């Protein structure tokens, strides 16, 4: 008998930084459902190693964002995840990439490290909703889409363009929306916040990481890829512009 079933989830081709997320998520969903229907439904899944393993540029960052969103969607059956490799010396074989690169005196982060640190800083344990893909924007999405969602027919559906998840803290004081835009064009995320505990007044802070998909940090420029903080007015219905090739964390804190 065993308690945890460990997996390795690597994407080996850098240009599959977004399609690899979907492939791995579909596999993990099937594995989770198989375990739940088995004679041992209490077995937990763990991702012992994962990464976009052949590059540490910003594609690895977007892949990390999509992967972490997928892992949150899997729910309590996923016990833990661990990216790999953690650290490499800059003189090592570059074939296998890492989260952190160093020489004998300094270091710089790979694209995945920057995203995982941001997501960890704004983690919220209760999952509310998630979405994937985009479609042609409506003139009034809150009326035409959200208010009539059961009858809505998305036009020009494009899967694999955006992944997003909304979570909240156990005390109900924070709502966190995390999203990744895999495309080289702007996309829009529309949100409606509702429920008995939704604050009437709140602050909204946005943390955005944006770069060309092939950009990467270095010993000379360790802060080449980093979050930029901004804010926006709080509304229960919000349209959020996702910059090209970007990862965004939006945090709402009730007053």
Descriptions of predicted regions:
Residues 11-16, 52-57, 87-93, 184-187, ...:
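Flexible loop/turn segments at secondary-structure boundaries
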Residues 1, 33-43, 70-79, 125, ...:
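Secondary-structure transition/capping motifs at alpha-helix termini
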Residues 18-41, 56-62, 146-186:
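Long hydrophobic segments that form regular secondary structure
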Residues 1-24, 48, 52, 78-79, ...:
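Aromatic- and acid-rich polysaccharide-binding/catalytic face
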Residues 3-4, 42-46, 77-82, 99, ...:
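Beta-sheet entry/capping signal
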Residues 46-163:
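Aromatic/acidic polysaccharide-binding cleft in carbohydrate-active enzymes
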Residues 143-159, 180-255:
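C-terminal beta-sandwich/jelly-roll accessory domains of carbohydrate-active enzymes
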Residues 9, 49, 82-85, 104, ...:
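Active-site proximal loops enriched in glycine and acidic residues that flank catalytic Cys/His/Asp
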């Amino acid at each position: 008998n065993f308690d945890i079933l460990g997996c390795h989830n690597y994407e080996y081709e850098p240009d599959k930084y977004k399609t690899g997320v979907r492939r791995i998520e579909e596999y993990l969903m099937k594995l989770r459902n198989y375990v739940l229907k088995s004679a041992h439904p209490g077995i937990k899944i763990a991702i012992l190693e994962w990464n976009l393993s052949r590059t540490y540029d910003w594609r690895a960052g977007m892949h990390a964002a999509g992967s972490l969103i997928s892992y949150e969607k899997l729910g309590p059956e996923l016990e833990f995840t661990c990216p790999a490799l953690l650290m490499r010396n800059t003189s090592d074989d570059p074939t296998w990439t890492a989260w952190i690169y160093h020489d004998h005196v300094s270091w710089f982060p790979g694209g995945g490290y920057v995203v995982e640190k941001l997501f960890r800083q704004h983690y919220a344990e209760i999952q509310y909703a998630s979405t994937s893909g985009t479609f042609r924007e409506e003139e009034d999405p809150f009326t035409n889409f959200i208010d009539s969602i059961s009858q809505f027919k998305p036009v020009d559906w494009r899967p694999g363009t955006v992944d997003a998840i909304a979570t909240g803290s156990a005390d109900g004081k924070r709502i966190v929306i995390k999203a990744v835009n895999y495309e080289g064009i702007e996309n829009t995320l529309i949100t409606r916040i509702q429920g008995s505990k939704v604050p009437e007044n709140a602050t909204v802070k946005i943390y955005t990481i944006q770069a060309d998909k092939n950009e990467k940090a270095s010993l000379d420029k360790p802060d080449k890829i980093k979050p930029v903080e901004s804010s926006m007015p709080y509304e229960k219905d919000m349209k959020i512009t996702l910059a090209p090739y970007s990862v965004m964390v939006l945090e709402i804190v009730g007053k």
